[in-house]
Amino acid sequence: MNTKARFTSLALALMLSSGATLAADLKIGVAMSQFDDTYLTYMREDMGKKAKDMGGVDLQFVDGRNDVNKQLDQVQELIGKKVDALIVNPVDTAATARITKAAIAAGIPLVYVNRRPDDPKLPAGVASVTSDDKEAGRLQMEYLAKKLDGKGTIVILLGELSNNSTRDRTEGVKEVLKKYPDIKIAEEQEGAWGRQKGMDITNNWLTQGRDFSAVVSNNDEMAIGAAMALKQAGKKQGDVLVAGVDGTPDGLSAVQKGQLTVSVFQDAKGQGEGSIDAAVKLAKKEALPQQAIVIPFKLITPENVNTFK
């Protein structure tokens, strides 16, 4: 065999070997509700690191841009690419039935992450990796109620109304308030998870002359916005208590600086990594310990904030 022939044979062998390796990789389509969300950005980054560390897992991320129909189209496109599994962070938790139906029809395992479908009954081949959002609301409100000595007036910054995370966190807050009849809710308004909206809404309340003892926010970003509005209005730290949820780096820093009174840690890494583990197991037709995997929340206070950094 001449040199050229030997080289061609070697190249072919390498190509076949490379092809075999690629064929062994699991392709997982990841449909995110939106890339432009602080908490979900951290979760997406953790998922990428997890897949890289595992090896043999190829993640294909798509951005739903907070559009239900766009996300459904993206899921269909991922199915058309014959991914081995799907991970979906739904735009609208009430609109997951079509996604579930499409995945089941294609025989592709599906894992919902961070936001669970409104229907708690998951069919075979479908799992969820989320947290108990009612617990988040209970934790932040119980802490605030004690700080307020069981009396005062609160306002609530709501996340997107299309998410059961918003409804459940708020319900958790209201469950606690049943034990504290002297704490009243003055206002509730949708801030759609955004810092700027949290700031604008709080500023409007202050401009209207609303008097409140605490701001209870469904997430850290809106809570930070509220704290900024309070500062601009000349309020001293501690005059109005502010509570968030997520424990993002910005949220942790805000607790450390006293801008936030309290937050609740939602484990982005745990949710992201857990969803990949579940998707890989389902793709390999391995059994999961449970279909609905729950990652616990943890209270973040000025006393323990450094343990979360």
Regions found by a protein language model. Give the residues of each.
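Gram-negative bacterial Sec-dependent N-terminal signal peptides
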Residues: M1-A23
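A residue-level marker of the well-folded mature domains of exported/periplasmic proteins
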Residues: R6, L22-K309
